[in-house]
Amino acid sequence: MRAASVPIDVRATYIEYMDINLTHPAPAFFISHGAPTFAMQPGQLGPVLTAAGRRMGAIKAALIVSPHWMTQGVRVASTPAPDTIHDFGGFPEPLYQIRYRAPGAPDWAAHAVQLLQSAGFAAEPDAGRGLDHGAWVPLRYLLPEANTPVFQISMPRDFDTAAAWRMGRALAPLRAQGVAIVGSGSLTHNLYEVFHGGKEAPYAQAFANWTSQAVLGGDIDALLHYRAQAPSAERAHPTEEHFLPLVVAAGAAAEGEQAQLLPGGMTYGVLAMDSYAWGLPLPEAA
C-alpha cells in the first residue's frame, strides 16, 4: 500500500496504463465489501481478492459501482485524483486514517458516460466525487498497490434488477478495452441483525447458497427475479441496493461466460462475503 506521504504523478501513471498491451479482456467482479472494518480485518476474502488481482494481470483501469453513492440519474466520477471518502461513523480511529491514493481515469469516465447515454441512462460526469468505502475497501485487496486508474459510477435512486442488468450490458464493451468492471455490494445485507443479533442465522447461508447456484449456473432470470425466487430474500436484503451491483457485474459478463466463486465465508453470523469473477484466469495447477 502506498504511504500517504508519497505523491503520485497522476498524468504519467494514467498514460502508462493507457499504453498497456492486453493479452485478454479485463475481468468483471462482484465483491462483497462487508463492514468498513474489512479494510483492516481481511478475514477469508481479503487474501482471495489479492490472489485474484495478481491473476488478473495488466488492466488499463477499474470501474467500480458502489451502493454508497446513489444519485438522481447516473453520475460517473471523472476526477483525476479521487479522495478517500470515510462515509461511516463509530468505528476505530485508525480506519479513518486509511487513504487509497489511486489515480482517477477521466478519459475512461467520459467513455463510460457515452456508453450509458447510448443505452438510455441519464448519465453525467462528476468531477468532484472521490471513492467511498464501498469502492476503496475492496480495492485495497484487489489492487493493493493503488497505481491502477480507478473511477466510480453511481447507482440511480430508482435502480432495480432490470436497470442493473442493462447497465452491466452497456458497460461490458469496456472489458475488451482493458477496463475491469467491479460491482461492490454484499451477498447478504441485514444490518439490523448485524448490529442487534450477531448470531449465526441459517437463512443467510441458504440465501448465499441459492445465489451462488444462480450465478455459477448462469441463471440470469433467477437473479433478475431473486426477490420472488430466493429463500428469505427480503430478510437477506431488506433493501436492494447491496444486491444490485451483483446484477451489474453479471450483466457485464459475456454470454455463456462462466463465473468463478471467490469464497469469503460469513461474518457477524449473517453477513455473507462470497464474491464472484467472470473472465478471471484460473489459478495455475500446483
State the predicted function of each range.
Residues 2-8:
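Extreme N-terminal basic, low-complexity initiation segments
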Residues 7, 14-16:
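Short, positively charged and aromatic/hydrophobic N-terminal segments
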Residues 18-115, 119, 123:
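A short aromatic-anchored loop/beta-hairpin motif
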Residues 27-31, 61-66, 153, 174-187, ...:
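Beta-strand elements within well-structured catalytic alpha/beta cores of enzymes
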Residues 45-50, 94-98, 130-137, 164-167:
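Short acidic (Asp/Glu) patches
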Residues 95-103, 125, 154-161, 233:
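Flexible, glycine/proline-enriched loop segments at strand-loop-helix junctions
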Residues 109-163:
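Internal, conserved structured core segments that host functional sites
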Residues 114, 118, 148-149, 159, ...:
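Surface-exposed, charge/polar-rich loops and edge strands
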